[in-house]
Amino acid sequence: MTLRQGTIGNKYQVKEIQLEDKVKRRLQMLGMTKGTEVRILNNKKSGSIIMKVRGTRFAIGRRIAEGILVEEGAYEQ
């Protein structure tokens, strides 16, 4: 599944990033690499997603979220 399909409050593990190299490198600099845990904090109607990665909150657009493949992990209660 893609990060865009994720549910608010759930944790996911990044399996693969299928984006152009420039965007992929930027995400890696922000700490998002294969195996990283990502928690979705908000999913805006516009398509942008606010998430927490390695203790840092940031937002990404719909196109980027659709290029990040994840596997569902533990739920945040």
Residue ranges, per PLM feature:
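Ubiquitin-like/PB1-type beta-grasp interaction modules and other compact soluble beta-rich domains
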Residues: 1-6, 60
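Short, conserved secondary-structure segments in the cores of folded domains
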Residues: 2, 26-28
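Short, structured beta-strand/loop micro-motifs enriched in basic residues and often containing a Trp
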Residues: 10-23
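C-terminal structural segments of small proteins and small subunits
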Residues: 12, 47-77
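Conserved hydrophobic positions within beta-strands
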Residues: 14, 37-40
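Short alpha-helix capping/helix-loop boundary micro-motifs
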Residues: 23-26, 36
